[in-house]
């Protein structure tokens, strides 16, 4: 678990990073650097979007799988790294 904490600290220390969170397979946040309401909102919506993206990738090619999801808007850039049991979500300023 110390390795996970160290990795999260390293990511959080990058310039422009607003917050990080780890979400379990049910979409429940288990680690976050953001406030509670923001965390719950992002976790639920991004979990749903990631599951849809995963399903779409598999529909196109059943041998393939989603490895990374990146969304860039005017305000933020959101990066999602899905794993079997967890999602790692990083939110940063897009201009950094």
From Swiss-Prot:
Covalent S-S links between cysteines: none
Listed Pfam families: Robl_LC7
Tissues in which the UniProt entry reports expression: High expression in heart, brain, placenta, skeletal muscle, prostate and small intestine; moderate in kidney, pancreas, spleen, testis, ovary and colon; low in lung, liver, thymus and leukocyte.
A cellular component annotation (GO) from this entry: cilium
SUPFAM superfamilies in alphabetical order: Roadblock/LC7 domain
GO-annotated biological processes: microtubule-based movement
Keyword terms: Acetylation, Cytoplasm, Cytoskeleton, Dynein, Microtubule, Motor protein, Transport
Annotated Gene3D superfamilies: Dynein light chain 2a, cytoplasmic
Modification sites for N-acetylalanine: 2
Locations listed in the record: Cytoplasm, Cytoskeleton
A single GO molecular function term of this UniProt record: microtubule motor activity
Signal peptide: none
Principal location class: cytoplasm
Family: Belongs to the GAMAD family.
Stated role: Acts as one of several non-catalytic accessory components of the cytoplasmic dynein 1 complex that are thought to be involved in linking dynein to cargos and to adapter proteins that regulate dynein function. Cytoplasmic dynein 1 acts as a motor for the intracellular retrograde motility of vesicles and organelles along microtubules.
Extra remark: Expression is significantly down-regulated in hepatocellular carcinoma (HCC) patients.
Complex and partners: Homodimer. The cytoplasmic dynein 1 complex consists of two catalytic heavy chains (HCs) and a number of non-catalytic subunits presented by intermediate chains (ICs), light intermediate chains (LICs) and light chains (LCs); the composition seems to vary in respect to the IC, LIC and LC composition. The heavy chain homodimer serves as a scaffold for the probable homodimeric assembly of the respective non-catalytic subunits. The ICs and LICs bind directly to the HC dimer and the LCs assemble on the IC dimer. Interacts with DYNC1I1 and DYNC1I2. Self-associates. Interacts with DYNLRB1.
UniProt-recorded name of the protein: Dynein light chain roadblock-type 2
Organism: Homo sapiens
Gene that specifies this protein: DYNLRB2
């Amino acid at each position: 678990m110390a390795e996970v904490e160290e990795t999260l600290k390293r990511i959080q220390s990058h310039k422009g990073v607003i917050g990080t969170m780890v979400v379990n397979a049910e979409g429940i946040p288990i680690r976050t650097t953001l406030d509670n309401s923001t965390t719950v909102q992002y976790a639920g919506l991004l979990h749903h979007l990631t599951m849809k993206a995963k399903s779409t990738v598999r529909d196109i090619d059943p041998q393939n799988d989603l490895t990374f999801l990146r969304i860039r808007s005017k305000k933020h850039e959101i990066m999602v790294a899905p794993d079997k049991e967890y999602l790692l979500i990083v939110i940063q300023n897009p201009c950094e």
